[in-house]
A protein has these predicted regions:
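Beta/alpha (TIM)-barrel catalytic core signal, keyed to glycine-rich beta->alpha loops juxtaposed to Asp/Glu
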Residues: 138-326
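Hydrophobic faces of well-ordered beta-strands that scaffold small-molecule active sites
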Residues: 14-18, 46-48, 80-84, 126-131, ...
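Short, acidic/polar
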Residues: 27-38, 106-121, 167-174
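Active-site groove signature of glycoside hydrolases
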Residues: 118-139
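Active-site mouth loops of central-metabolism enzymes
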Residues: 19-29, 96-108, 132, 137
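N-terminal binding-site loop/beta-alpha segment at the start of enzyme catalytic domains
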Residues: 1-81, 152, 237-241
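Structural motif corresponding to the early beta-alpha repeats
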Residues: 73-103
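Aromatic/hydrophobic pocket-lining residues that form the small-molecule binding cavity
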Residues: 31, 66, 110, 114, ...
Length: 326
């Protein structure tokens, strides 16, 4: 497993991370097996969020399962990195209508939720805490108070953002100032073969061929993150972005799966491994967040972290996924 430095921090972590959004559906033994599988493949970075508990309909549920699982798997706290996300309020009171009620970057909300996460995870600090989605009502003094309080108390070592555009990140960083402890080190964004808009937007710059619609929805996120030395963390990299779910082995995406199978045969690995390798091939040094709770499938995905795709193979897969080369 290759390691990468997260942002400008001194943290050298595995380039693949385990995301535990669905871990609340597992019992203790199954969760420990998933964590153990990840660790055996070199993973030392684990990503969660305060709202992950959609199966059991309860806040902090996945974090609580992870908090036991990393210990049951025989891992030591000093050997792993734990990351959580906060800033969304979910109403779980009606199991048939679970929904977000607001985004909340108030100091009180962020500090309270982080404390609850620490208790759930069974630790007294997290290595990274990310603002989960942008709060349009966020206020500078509230963000600064929350981050400063949490860092000085030793509860959060580094910070980051998730699902924000470049200008939102710039605004936040302008409030937080130049203190290295307040740097936004990571930016978690959806990215994968069938969610490659960050790339297609940049390829389409100054392009407008007949029949080609050009619209930039990512605001230059890819280049911005590289310029600011923010590590992109790719979430849901195997999702198709459609009603059909994951794309690997899915009959609704025959061209992509044909290409994946061809490359898998060439490199002697699974299609899942190739899909992982595609994300990690980009020189932006993206960290992939894999969320499979199936140990066999997770192992196949993680095998891709050791593959260096040929450039042409990378482009072949990009096109097979329905993306255009202008």
């Amino acid at each position: 497993m290759k390691s990468i430095v997260i942002g400008k921090s001194a943290v050298g972590a595995s380039q693949a991370a385990l995301g535990v959004m669905r871990m609340d559906a597992l019992d203790a033994d199954a969760a420990a097996e998933v964590v153990r599988t990840a660790a055996e493949h070199g993973v030392n970075f684990f990503d969660t969020a305060d709202i992950y508990g959609f199966n059991v309909k309860h806040d902090h549920a996945s974090s609580r399962v992870l908090g036991r699982a990393w210990k049951d798997a025989g891992l030591k706290r000093e050997d792993i990195f734990l990351q959580t996300k906060f800033g969304i309020n979910i109403d779980f009171s009606d199991p048939n209508n679970v929904h977000a009620t607001r985004y909340d970057f108030s100091a009180k909300h962020l500090i309270t939720r982080l404390d609850e996460e620490l208790e759930a995870l069974g630790t007294d600090y997290v290595d990274f805490a990310l603002l989960h989605r942008p709060d349009t009502l966020m206020e500078a003094e509230e963000i600064v108070e929350a981050f400063t309080t949490l860092h000085k108390a030793g509860k959060v070592r580094h910070f980051g953002v998730s699902n924000v555009n470049p200008w939102q990140a710039e605004l936040l960083q302008s409030w937080l100032g130049d203190d290295p402890a307040m740097r936004l080190e990571a930016s978690q964004l959806q990215f994968g073969l069938m969610h490659a808009q960050m790339i297609s937007d940049e390829l389409m710059t100054n392009s407008g061929a007949e029949g080609m619609v050009v619209a930039n929805h990512s605001d230059g996120l890819l280049s911005y993150s590289r310029l600011r030395h923010m590590t992109i963390q790719a979430w849901s990299p195997f999702q198709s972005g459609t009603e059909y779910g994951p794309f690997v082995g899915n009959e609704h995406f025959p061209e992509l799966n044909k290409a994946l199978d061809e490359k898998a045969a060439k490199y002697g690995v699974s299609a899942n491994a190739i899909a992982t390798a595609w994300v990690l091939r980009h020189p932006a040094k993206i960290q992939i967040v894999l969320g499979s709770m199936n140990p066999t499938r997770l192992g196949e995905m993680l095998d891709g972290a050791d593959i260096d795709l040929d450039k042409q193979d990378w482009w072949d897969l990009y096109v097979a996924a329905g993306n255009l080369i202008p």
